[in-house]
Amino acid sequence: MCGSYYGNYYGDHGYGCCGYEGLGYGYGSLRCGYSSCCGYGHGYGSRFFCGCGYGCGSGYYY
């Protein structure tokens, strides 16, 4: 589960930071972890879109 420290408040699109191999590193619209994408989820107006549960573990931008 992506963003495991804070849970997936938006279902598949976890609130917070999606780190390498799906670990959670902090929260908010900041980049953190190794090759990660953070934000409020895919399509929530965040600068960094992260499809938690789809490609977040690899740090893909959507």
UniProtKB/Swiss-Prot annotation:
Q: One GO BP annotation here?
A: keratinization
For whether the record's keyword set contains Disulfide bond, the answer is no
The record's listing under InterPro entries reads: KAP6
**GO annotation, cellular component aspect:** cytosol; intermediate filament
> According to its UniProt entry, what is the function of this protein?
In the hair cortex, hair keratin intermediate filaments are embedded in an interfilamentous matrix, consisting of hair keratin-associated proteins (KRTAP), which are essential for the formation of a rigid and resistant hair shaft through their extensive disulfide bond cross-linking with abundant cysteine residues of hair keratins. The matrix proteins include the high-sulfur and high-glycine-tyrosine keratins.
Native source organism of the sequence: Homo sapiens (Human)
Name the source's superkingdom: Eukaryota
Which keywords accompany this UniProt record?
A: Keratin, Repeat
What is this protein called in UniProt? Keratin-associated protein 6-2
Q: Which residues form the signal peptide?
A: none
On assembly, the entry states:
Interacts with hair keratins.
What does the sequence similarity comment in the record state about its family? Belongs to the KRTAP type 6 family.
> GO molecular function of the protein, one example?
identical protein binding
